[in-house]
């Protein structure tokens, strides 16, 4: 009898745990990235097409959007909310862009914000806000693994530490030769993929800049110019 009760108890915990995992953008992001065929993803600013096989009648996984379009759809899927509820929360008439995520994280609107890389956890997002007049408003990525401090790689910046952090994003360019979108000979496929982003910090872990990858040819960008923040969703949707 005791054994049966224990089995039922552990099964209950497993079901609860599985349900909790499905209610996260990390779960849906990894599911999408691992299963989307290469022919079913590319980078575009047009109306997003993001599908999970078996969800809402979708016959396959598909991801044709841009960086913010991906995160928008992940949140809607994980929290089962429609466009109206999402746009009301993000204070947008149509859709949210990377700069909007940076602004809302900064304000604490449904997010807890961090600027120390040591606070970053899987399931958080990295939001970057570009200066005005640039073609894009910024970039946003989903963190899948905790940051790891690495030996400094060129370009080096005096007085900084370097970290690599694994992310999923929708981009026109992959993050180095270990990125899943890398085709060889310096070429990349656009669309959904995963790779390592490089963060520069001061001695305490506060973010001072970044580079697109851990490759030596990746340019250093100052966080004073291209503003960087880490966001953790804590919004309660009704």
Residue ranges and their predicted role:
Residues 1:
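Cell-wall glycan-active module
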Residues 4-16:
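Sec-dependent N-terminal signal peptides
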Residues 9, 59-60, 111-112:
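Generic anion/oxyanion-binding catalytic loop in active/binding sites
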Residues 20-87, 213-238:
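N-terminal capping segments
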Residues 49-58, 149-160, 188:
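Low-complexity, polar-biased intrinsically disordered regions enriched in Pro/Ser/Thr/Gly
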Residues 86-174:
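...with weaker cross-activation on analogous glycine-rich loops/strands in unrelated enzymes
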Residues 161, 166-238:
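Low-complexity, Gly/Ser/Thr/Pro-rich intrinsically disordered linker/tail segments
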């Amino acid at each position: 009898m005791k054994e049966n009760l224990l089995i039922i108890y552990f099964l209950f915990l497993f079901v609860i745990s599985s349900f909790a995992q499905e209610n996260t953008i990390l779960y849906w992001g990894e599911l999408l990235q691992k299963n989307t065929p290469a022919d079913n993803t590319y980078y575009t600013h047009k109306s997003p097409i993001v599908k999970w096989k078996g969800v809402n009648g979708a016959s396959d996984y598909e991801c044709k959007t841009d960086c913010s379009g991906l995160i928008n759809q992940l949140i809607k899927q994980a929290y089962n909310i429609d466009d109206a509820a999402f746009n009301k929360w993000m204070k947008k008439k149509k859709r949210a862009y990377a700069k909007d995520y940076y602004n809302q994280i900064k304000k604490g609107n449904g997010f807890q914000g961090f600027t120390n890389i040591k606070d970053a956890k899987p399931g958080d997002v990295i939001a970057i806000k570009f200066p005005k007049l640039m073609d894009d408003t910024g970039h946003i990525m989903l963190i899948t693994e905790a940051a790891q401090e690495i030996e400094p790689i060129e370009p080096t910046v005096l007085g900084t530490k370097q970290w690599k952090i694994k992310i999923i994003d929708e981009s026109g360019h992959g993050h180095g030769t270990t990125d899943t979108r890398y085709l060889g000979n310096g070429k990349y496929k656009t669309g959904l993929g995963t790779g390592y982003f490089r963060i520069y910090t001061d001695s305490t872990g506060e973010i001072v800049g970044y580079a697109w990858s851990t490759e030596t040819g990746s340019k250093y960008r100052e966080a004073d110019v291209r503003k960087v923040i880490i966001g953790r969703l804590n919004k309660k949707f009704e």
